[in-house]
A protein has these predicted regions:
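Serine-dependent acyl-ester chemistry module
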Residues: 83-227, 235, 240-251, 258-259
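Solvent-exposed, polar/charged alpha-helical surfaces in well-ordered, non-transmembrane soluble domains
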Residues: 37, 41, 58, 62, ...
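Conserved SGNH/GDSL esterase-like catalytic core that processes O-acyl groups on lipids
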Residues: 25-106
Length: 285
């Protein structure tokens, strides 16, 4: 979970570091076509991408703390908070007072979350990344017909549901929406404190899944929570909801989905990543 330009990969000093889950990692496109890769190329800033599949706030906190203790330096950390972070953070992970993350119920699952992301993810989990990327690419060669509604897996639908559910406790979630969000905010508060101690700037970004475009509102609870968190903390709060909602309102949900997302998947395609990069570059000067 550490990507950068080849000539920079052994360096421990970066202008910008990005962290998030598979959306930030860039699954399944190449680094150069991801919003982080485009940002690095266009701005010339030394940039590290720390994102990897299934990361969430507890891991953002643990991983950044680990890297700083190992002597890595960033001027500015940008966290891309994903819609699925709520489910992953509350259902999968526990964190102790030493900021060590473990997987909940790992004995029952018989997978120990890929030996917990290769023993707490120093800089790897490469094999799972390659396998997942190959499988993802092979599943997305066909283009979505303009009148064809996307079909998502039940797990994807479940992870998206919390932002537009009328219920505080959703079946399949370990915690209620209010309690779960408070736990995520608490982790991010701790991350902010660690960054502040080293004079590292923090910015935060939010963006919609296709589910939010179809079922949620532009001023989603996901937006409200992190906009409120960012007051007096973040250098920038980067809200991508208006871009995609405006596009949808000027065309249609299906047209917007087809243009920016992969078929039957909530991840952004190359066009979507270009949109993320464009706004990012406009804000981060």
């Amino acid at each position: 979970g550490f990507k950068s330009k080849c000539k920079q990969i052994d360096d421990k000093n970066y202008n910008f570091a990005f962290i998030g889950d598979s959306f930030t990692e860039g699954t399944p496109i190449e680094y150069e076509d991801s919003f982080v890769g485009i940002f690095a190329e266009k701005t010339g800033y030394k940039t590290a991408n720390l994102g990897i599949v299934s990361y969430s706030p507890k891991i953002y906190l643990s991983k950044v703390n680990y890297l700083l203790q190992e002597g890595f330096k960033f001027d500015h950390l940008i966290v891309f908070i994903d819609i699925s972070d709520f489910y992953d953070d509350t259902n999968f992970y526990s964190i102790d007072q030493n900021l060590k993350v473990t997987e909940k119920y790992s004995e029952k699952k018989n997978l120990k979350r890929r030996k917990f992301l290769r023993n707490n993810f120093p800089l790897t989990n490469f094999y799972m990344f390659v396998l997942k990327k190959y499988k993802f690419r092979s599943n997305h060669k066909k283009k979505l017909n303009i009148n064809e509604s996307p079909i998502f897996t039940d797990k994807v639908n479940l992870k998206a549901k919390w932002t537009y559910s009328n219920e505080n406790k959703i079946e399949g979630y370990d915690l209620g929406i209010r309690e779960g969000n408070q736990i995520m905010v608490d982790q991010m508060e701790k991350l902010y404190e660690i960054l502040s101690q080293q004079s590292i700037k923090l910015s935060l970004a939010v963006y919609p899944w296709p589910h939010q475009l179809e079922n949620d509102v532009i001023n989603s609870i996901h937006v409200k929570i992190w906009q409120e968190f960012c007051k007096n903390k973040c250098e920038n709060f980067i809200n991508y909801f208006p871009i995609f909602f405006d596009e949808m309102n000027n065309s249609s949900y299906l047209e917007t989905y087809k243009k920016y997302y992969f078929k039957n998947d909530p991840h952004f395609n190359k066009v979507g990543h270009k949109v993320l990069a464009k706004k990012l570059i406009e804000i981060i000067k």
